[in-house]
A protein has these predicted regions:
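Membrane-interface helix-loop junctions and terminal tails of multi-pass membrane proteins
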Residues: 1-312
Length: 312
């Protein structure tokens, strides 16, 4: 075996270059956000697809893009997931910050593409496309046109509650299906598809299913000043605070659970050390007894020899 073959390859040596990983987060986020914007705008306005289809398609999009880029960057595609990965040590802080920047730029790029690709006219304004696409609450909720007629609005408290709960599901699924270095396990894509699909079903009637600060930011910028009931950028802070809060909660649970697990392993280690020391003492005692026995035999043989000499 050569020296090269005998040297194990470390995880750091196996990881992809940082530029490649950041590029994967950028392109992956662009594809995800563009697909979701298209589903919500074209699908809702033209075909009137319901929440079930939006939830299903959102989950499929995240799962598919995770399969494509999971082996490169770990397929985070969400600033909340990146924050949790940094807090738990799965991702280096510098890498995580660059991931977040790439994710937001991907969302903005997707928002720009949708803004300039969707057709408009005097009858079909950009507002019609954006109403089911932009994330918001109260008068900007996708349910406002229906519930508003009955004097009911879905306000900020409900928006925060559903976004935090959905964020916890997504972040926990991401951490559970990535290894200690943030790389995807075999079931990562399926888990993320299910998590985002479930999160969409929970949040879409209230907020339009932000779930991802990059997704909310990308479309909010280009929907600003387009005649919506409320300006999207004024409500955008909710869709950053809630996912990051969810990330912090999940990361705290993971860290505390790890500390508890470490403490439980300490007594086992002490017992093992005691057993080893005990076995060592017993072994030394056995060796000593064996040496004493040999010395007794030698003394007995010497005594017999002396008696034989005297007899002669």
């Amino acid at each position: 075996m050569t020296a090269v073959e005998a040297t194990p390859i470390t995880k750091e040596e196996q990881s992809k270059p940082l530029a490649l990983r950041v590029g994967a987060e950028l392109v992956g986020s662009f594809i995800i956000c563009f697909a979701i914007y298209a589903i919500c705008s074209l699908g809702s306005a033209v075909y009137g697809i319901n929440m079930a289809f939006i939830a299903l398609l959102t989950g499929i999009v995240y799962a598919a893009v995770t399969v494509i880029f999971g082996s490169i960057s770990g397929a985070q595609f969400n600033p909340a997931v990146s924050v949790a990965a940094m807090l738990t040590g799965k991702t280096h802080v510098l890498d995580g910050i660059l991931y977040i920047i790439a994710q937001v730029l991907g969302g903005i790029g997707a928002g720009a593409a949708i803004r300039f690709l969707l057709p408009t006219s005097e009858q079909v304004t950009f507002k019609i496309w954006m109403t089911p696409t932009v994330n918001g609450f109260d008068k900007n909720s996708v349910s406002y046109s229906t519930l508003g007629n009955y004097g009911v609005t879905l306000g900020i408290t409900l928006a925060i509650a559903v976004e935090v709960v959905a964020g916890i599901i997504i972040v926990a699924s991401a951490l559970r299906t990535t290894d200690g270095h943030g790389e995807s396990k075999t079931n990562h894509a399926v888990a993320m598809g299910l998590a985002y699909g479930n999160g969409t079903a929970i949040t879409y009637p209230v907020t339009g299913a932000a779930l991802n600060p990059a997704r909310a930011t990308g479309i909010a910028i280009f929907a600003q000043n387009q005649g919506l009931n409320e300006e999207p950028l004024q409500q955008l802070w909710v869709f950053w605070i809630c996912p990051v809060l969810a990330a912090a909660v999940v990361a705290l649970v993971v860290i505390v659970a790890g500390m508890i697990g470490t403490k439980k392993n300490v007594p086992d280690t002490v017992e093992t050390i005691d057993e080893v020391e005990g076995n060592t003492v017993l072994g030394e005692a056995s060796v000593a007894d064996g040496n004493d026995g040999e010395q007794d035999e030698q003394s007995y043989a010497q005594a017999n020899a002396d008696e034989s000499v005297e007899s002669n």
